[in-house]
């Protein structure tokens, strides 16, 4: 992967430096907002409301600057990832069209097709995540460590140690997961080859004879994918459990300090440290998706490198230069110019997909029950943290110490139970998704004979539905369905608990959530059409490339490399444009979410400090409200990211059902 990333990102090093600089500024502005809140808290004893309002104005300025940084990073990252994908597809095609036929013959056609379409698409998404999210983490860790170091050196060391532990777990665990994914990935090649044979048989009215082989290939793929998934589904919950464990250690340190009369961490400082930790956790919302995508991106990069390293073997000699050939044409050329998206009714598609999922409704219900309990545990935890802080500020008698340690124990139980139940819910969804994928593969294979699509689309366009679209459907069931449920549930529960904590401050959140929804719906509607067209174009690209590979020797004989590369460039450019146009809309969601979140937090800070100054609420209550605000931000950000996957998944579901349901009656 290192070679591939170096190959595709080197031409964009100047833009990457800009992203790094902006990531540093973004982190500074976000942490400065929290630091300003600390300054505002210290003004409570002085009862200087004018100074607090001035601090609020400064926070607003930093919020605007942070949003601008995020927006620029999003635009640059989208352009860089789109250009990397465009150049990679172009280079792969150029190499293959100019390689000697014996070199091309060493690869399976289906494998070369998938590298250009789904393979490059996978790398594109990974590169975008790398630029937008991963590059931000070193700045956040460094910034928080330095700020905590000024407050308490021992706790700064604990924070660094926890991050080192997370890195070690990721490094060694992901190494094994990648190896298992390579084994699972190999099974896709056999499935694609057998499915392509089936398409050819149906198109040419040849008697079908390979169903058992196809079923065996699906069985093998199911077994290896289950083994791969079971080795990585629990990694993200464990990492977040470690991060939340840092809060437990902080509470224990403060409690210990009060018990033995040692000034460990000032209560106000501890509130600020908790906010730093909560902000750090919110920046890691992408980690589960990164863990899921990394093995795919790693394996795909290796497969792409296998083609790119063949550039030295390109045969540049022009054959038959004196012969005047007409321009080479393909029988399936018309398929690539198709722009019309299937008119299958959206409601009907959702209904069919719902019926498919209903066969596993009891497992779904059980999984969602576990997820509900898990969410309840995690969402209730901030209330316990607030109670502990209130107990610290109430006095130092023995009874309160016992209650404090009881609350710390309760907090530990909530975190452990919450993340363990979340992991087991993920395990159930893995089996459901893999089984549905297995059944859909068999159905597509069986019903292909009578499908109308067999005469309407190219062979490779049909193949992309089992190679690309079915994988998207599986990912939606396995990851995004439960994610969306958990996110919506978290938002609902957080709003309820905020209301029960303090109804006055909760009004701010109840006003903010509909604004989030309206903005995100607008961006979602604008990006939907581009996603559907993008998926259709990927299918057409696979069809065009298959035509070229099957006629590779003839293309070279007639010196048509430049002509087919020109046609490929046209399709490739359209794919790039559709990707960037859809990502520009969805890419605005995260900066907008951050802006609205910071604006909401500033209002909560000012109003909360005013109530604290007048003795109407306690410090622990304000901290609980603030943590709930961060906890509300996390599912909202995840929900915005999930919208992208929902659009891709929805268009993929339509394309799968076009094969299964759109058939001629015998």
Give the ranges of each region predicted by the language model.
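Cytosolic ends of transmembrane helices, especially the final helix of ABC transmembrane type-1 domains
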Residues: 210, 234, 280-307, 430, ...
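Short, membrane-interfacial amphipathic segments enriched in basic
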Residues: 1-2, 102, 106, 333-351, ...
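Primarily residues marking transmembrane-helix entry/exit sites
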Residues: 12-17, 52, 56, 72, ...
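An intracellular "coupling" helix at the cytosolic face of ABC transporter transmembrane type-1 domains
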Residues: 13, 101-102, 118-127, 131, ...
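Juxtamembrane helix-loop junctions of ABC transporter transmembrane domains
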Residues: 29-38, 42, 62-105, 109, ...
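Transmembrane helix-loop-helix hairpins at lipid-water interfaces of multipass membrane proteins
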Residues: 13-72, 76, 149-156, 263-267, ...
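A hydrophobic transmembrane-helix motif
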Residues: 32-38, 65-70, 131-174, 230-278, ...
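Primarily ABC-family ATPase nucleotide-binding module
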Residues: 308-346, 660-666
């Amino acid at each position: 992967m290192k070679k591939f990333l170096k190959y595709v990102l080197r031409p964009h090093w100047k833009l990457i430096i800009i992203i790094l600089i902006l990531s540093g500024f973004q982190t500074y502005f976000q942490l400065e907002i929290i630091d300003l809140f600390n300054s505002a808290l210290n003004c409570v004893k002085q009862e200087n409301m004018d100074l607090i309002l001035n601090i609020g104005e400064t926070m607003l300025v930093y919020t605007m600057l942070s949003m601008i940084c995020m927006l620029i990073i999003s635009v640059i990252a989208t352009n860089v990832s789109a250009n990397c994908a465009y150049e990679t597809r172009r280079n792969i095609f150029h190499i293959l069209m100019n390689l000697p036929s014996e070199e091309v013959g060493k690869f399976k056609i289906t494998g070369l097709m998938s590298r250009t379409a789904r393979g490059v698409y996978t790398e594109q998404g990974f590169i975008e995540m790398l630029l937008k999210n991963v590059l931000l983490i070193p700045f956040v860790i460094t910034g928080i460590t330095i700020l905590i170091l000024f407050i308490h050196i021992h706790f700064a060391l604990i924070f660094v140690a926890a991050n080192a532990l997370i890195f070690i777990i990721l490094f060694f665990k992901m190494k094994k997961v990648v190896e298992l994914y390579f084994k699972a990935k190999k099974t896709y090649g056999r499935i694609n080859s057998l499915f392509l044979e089936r398409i050819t048989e149906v198109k040419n009215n040849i008697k079908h004879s390979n169903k058992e082989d196809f079923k065996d290939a699906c069985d093998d793929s199911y077994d290896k994918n289950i083994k791969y998934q079971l080795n990585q589904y629990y990694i993200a919950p464990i990492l977040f459990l470690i991060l939340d464990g840092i809060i437990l250690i902080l509470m224990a340190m403060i409690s210990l300090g009060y018990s033995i009369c040692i000034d460990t961490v000032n209560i106000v400082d501890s509130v600020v440290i908790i906010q730093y930790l909560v902000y750090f956790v919110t920046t890691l919302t992408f980690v589960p998706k990164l863990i899921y995508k990394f093995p795919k991106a790693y394996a795909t990069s290796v497969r792409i490198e296998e083609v790119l390293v063949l550039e030295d073997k390109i045969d540049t000699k022009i054959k038959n230069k004196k012969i005047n050939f007409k321009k080479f044409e393909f029988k399936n050329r018309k398929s690539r110019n198709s722009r019309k998206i299937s008119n299958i009714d959206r409601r009907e598609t959702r209904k069919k997909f719902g019926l498919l999922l209903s066969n596993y409704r009891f497992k779904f219900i059980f999984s969602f029950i576990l997820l509900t309990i898990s969410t309840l545990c995690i969402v209730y935890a901030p209330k316990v943290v607030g109670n502990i802080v209130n107990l610290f500020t109430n006095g130092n008698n023995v009874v309160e110490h016992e209650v404090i340690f009881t609350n710390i124990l309760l907090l530990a139980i909530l975190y452990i139970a919450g993340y363990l139940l979340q992991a087991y819910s993920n395990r159930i969804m893995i089996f459901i998704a893999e089984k549905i994928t297995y059944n859909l593969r068999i159905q597509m294979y069986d019903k292909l004979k009578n499908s109308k699509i067999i005469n309407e689309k190219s062979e490779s366009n049909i193949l992309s539905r089992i190679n690309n679209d079915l994988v998207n459907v599986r990912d939606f069931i396995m990851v995004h369905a439960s994610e969306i449920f958990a996110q919506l549930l978290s938002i609902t529960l957080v709003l309820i608990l905020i209301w029960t904590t303090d109804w006055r401050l909760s009004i701010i959140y109840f006003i903010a959530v509909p604004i989030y929804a309206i903005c995100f719906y607008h961006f979602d509607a604008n990006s939907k059409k581009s996603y559907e067209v993008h998926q259709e174009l990927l299918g057409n690209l696979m069809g065009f490339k298959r035509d070229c590979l099957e006629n590779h020797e003839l293309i070279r004989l007639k010196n048509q490399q430049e002509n087919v590369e020109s046609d490929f460039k046209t399709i490739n450019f359209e794919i790039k444009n559709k990707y960037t146009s859809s990502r520009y809309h969805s890419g605005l969601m995260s900066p907008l979410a951050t802006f609205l979140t910071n604006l909401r937090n500033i209002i909560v800070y000012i109003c909360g400090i005013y109530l604290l100054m007048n003795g109407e609420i306690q410090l622990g209550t304000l901290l609980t409200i603030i943590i709930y605000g961060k906890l509300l931000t996390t599912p909202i950000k995840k929900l915005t990211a999930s919208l992208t996957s929902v659009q891709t998944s929805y268009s993929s579901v339509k394309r799968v059902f076009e094969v299964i349901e759109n058939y001629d009656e015998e």
